[in-house]
Amino acid sequence: DGVSLIIPVALLNQVEDQGFDWLIPALRHELLVALIKALPKQYRRNFVPAPNYADALMQTISPQDGKLLDAVSNRLKRMSGVTIPEDAWELSSVPVHLKMNFKVVDDNGKVLQQSRSLSILKQGLQGEVQQSLSQVAEQGIEQEQLTQWSFGTLPREYVKLQAGYEIKAFPALIDDKHSVSIKLLDNPEQARALSLLGLRRLLLLNIPSPV
């Protein structure tokens, strides 16, 4: 039930968890009512009837205002003078169908995993994302058994258009102890950190032995 967003696994690393808390306009009023009704009584009693306050919120806030709960809290405070602490919002009490569902699919459209949490999906599908990025890489991008800097400039970002999607990956120089390799990763920070270690290994491999 509710709304599902279909995400190709190769694009999972590019989807930011921003804006999905607002859901779609058709369900937003119901979501706002549910949020207000889920407040602890000491706060909820200030916003009765909840549907009326939801009506007012629908007219005065939008996704351009940032995070949904921040926008709702700020607007309700302006309307009533009541400050709602962040931890007063009981998201667990909101019906499941009022939370965005994320479905990650493979190249054949088969659902690999689905969850209401994007971060859980990213953590659980790291291996599948990595494999998918390797499959779309052009020949020569990923290399192994390198002992010299024979691959030119290593770009910070690799972009490829596939099936109408712009797939982004981040080349990293990986330390393999006796050599280095170039791998495409889904995380730019991880790629930078590992590349520093890979660069160190490559330098050590090219220092002449004192013996």
Label each PLM-derived region with a short phrase:
Residues 1-211:
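A positional "C-terminalness" feature that preferentially activates on distal terminal regions of long
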